[in-house]
UniProtKB/Swiss-Prot annotation:
NCBIfam families: proB. Keywords: Amino-acid biosynthesis, ATP-binding, Cytoplasm, Kinase, Nucleotide-binding, Proline biosynthesis, Transferase. Substrate binds at S59, D146, N158. Its EC number is 2.7.2.11. InterPro entries: AceGlu_kinase-like_sf (IPR036393), Asp/Glu/Uridylate_kinase (IPR001048), G5K_ProB (IPR041739), Glu/AcGlu_kinase (IPR001057), Glu_5kinase (IPR011529), Glu_5kinase/COase_Synthase (IPR005715), Glutamate_5-kinase_CS (IPR019797), PUA (IPR002478). It comes from the Bacteria. ATP binds at K19, T178, D179. This is Glutamate 5-kinase.
């Protein structure tokens, strides 16, 4: 099925997560493919210089480590895989740093585990760092921290990580670059009747039946992981494109509105998806009461909540917990992720940010709840 929605999903995307797999990043297992990485970095630079924000999720550390260690086949022992990841991550980060710098774009290395994103405080810290980097025009290059996490090496995949990062930074779109042109109704290598899927709804159960299962010996995921990643990304309102990574100027053509690969469309708008997630799936831990001025800014303008506008704190909560923002009449205006614990919040009520360091000994954020981590409940 095709439609015009594909022409706008990437064209209108301001914040994009790009995931590239091992089979593309590496030169048939003989270390990193410098030319390919250089080409993607050139395209990333054009996107950033054009006003877009881009996060790169890249596989390749283990494959590069295998090459540097002289290993011809992927080992099975976890500690050997972790050793390869540690060795290879050095080269992977250096390659991206070099190629992005050649295009006058800064880069940053970020290693994450699923546990980092499952813990709300670490989630908030990771989000703040990534959003800051994007605001600086830097391209964060993210990989799983395979060296310290056994389960990710055994069962994880960077398709899932790409979707989690898309959720984390509230991306408008996820682009998964792979060694196939997209999704087919069956394996085209085995079934001559297989038809290419240009567009479908992310999360459609029929997609999982279509997807092939096995990946290459270098990587960890087949097409099924990409289908599930698109479903996860759609949960926060991000549409996903699965496309051939060697397609000339694939990223640039996608943002121009060209139809490349398979588009899996999120069925829920980004703000609506985030509001539903925060309102329905995270337990409310406490609340802050705000004065009339702060209430007006939150309600009418969707502004961040500053501690100077807070008049009271109820409940016991930690940084990263979900709290309610209420006006003087007890009406719930919004919900959001707290940047400070309840103990700290009580100290910060009615205080300007200039006094935070004196009161707490540090400054985490100037806001109690940032507008990017807040959803309005009324109005």
């Amino acid at each position: 099925m095709t439609s015009n929605s594909g022409s706008t999903a990437l064209r209108d995307a301001r914040r994009i997560v790009v995931k590239v797999g091992s089979s593309l990043v590496t030169n048939e297992g003989r270390g990193l493919d410098e030319a390919a990485i250089g080409e993607w970095c050139r395209q990333l630079a054009v996107l950033v210089q054009g006003g877009r924000e881009v996060v790169m999720v890249s596989s390749g550390a283990i494959a590069e480590g295998m090459k540097r260690l002289g290993w011809r086949t992927r080992p099975h022992e976890v500690h050997e895989l972790q050793a390869a990841a540690a060795v290879g991550q050095m080269g992977l980060a250096q390659m991206y740093e070099t190629k992005l710098r050649e295009n006058r774009i800064g880069s940053a290395q970020v290693l994450l585990t699923h546990a980092d994103l499952a813990d709300r405080e670490r989630y908030l810290n990771a989000r703040s760092t990534l959003v800051t980097l994007l605001g600086l025009g830097v391209v964060p290059v993210i990989n799983e921290n395979d060296t310290v996490v056994n389960d990710e090496i055994k069962f994880g995949d960077n398709d899932t990580l790409g979707a989690l990062v898309a959720n984390l930074v509230e991306a408008d779109a996820l682009v998964i670059l792979t060694d196939q042109k997209g999704l087919y109704t069956a394996d085209p290598r085995k079934d001559p009747q297989a038809k290419f899927v240009h567009e479908a709804a992310a999360g459609d159960p029929a997609l999982e039946a279509m997807a092939g299962g096995a990946g290459s010996s270098l990587g960890r995921g087949g097409m099924i992981t990409k289908i599930l990643a698109a479903k996860r990304a759609a949960g926060s309102g991000a549409s996903t494109v699965i496309a051939w990574g060697r397609e000339p100027d694939a990223l640039l053509r996608l943002v121009r509105g060209e139809s490349i690969g398979t588009l899996l469309v999120a069925q829920t708008a980004k703000h609506q998806a985030r509001k539903r997630w925060m309102a329905d799936h995270l337990q409310l831990r406490g609340a802050v009461t705000v004065d009339a001025g702060a209430a007006a800014k939150v309600r009418a303008e969707g502004k961040s909540l500053l501690p100077i506008g807070m008049t009271g704190v109820s409940g016991e909560f930690s940084r990263g917990d979900v709290i309610a923002v209420r006006d003087a009449d007890g009406v719930e205006l919004a919900r959001g992720l707290a940047n400070y614990s309840s103990v700290e919040a009580r100290l910060l009520c009615r205080k300007p940010s200039s006094e935070f360091e004196r009161l707490l000994g540090y400054v985490a954020e100037p806001e109690m709840v940032h507008r990017d981590n807040m959803v309005l409940m009324r109005g």
